[in-house]
Amino acid sequence: KDGNFSNWWTAKDAEDFKARSQVMVDFFGNISVLPDLKANGELTLGENLADHGGLMVSYQAFKNATKNAPLGVADGFTPEQRFFLAYASVWAGNIRDEEIRNLTKSDPHSLGRWRVNGALPHIDAWYEAFGITESDPLFVPKEKRVTIW
């Protein structure tokens, strides 16, 4: 009511969250957006966490909504594949190198390409949907994937 906030996390909760978040900072900070420029994992952390959490929750909602009335294969894609393709299609686009450089230095959102190629490799259901294996370019070993919640 009065805008008063109280910290309900324990010190251990905060420490664990910081450690788990650092996995995402490091992952995104190692993405080469241009040959001479890496993404800024610190700058984009909040939005990357939001994308990750949103994907996890929306996928659970999708599975819940379709459990009693399963969807079939359409155009050769399973419902689970279509879920992830729909997410990816939102971020499709072309962008000039100058704008990549500008946004990477100033925007707290990852570039569209990395909101897909950086987010999906941390979602176990994406691996299952597409049968992603170690030989696939976006594969991230399970122990290196972000697990926040």
Regions found by a protein language model. Give the residues of each.
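Zinc-dependent metallohydrolase catalytic domains
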Residues: 1-149
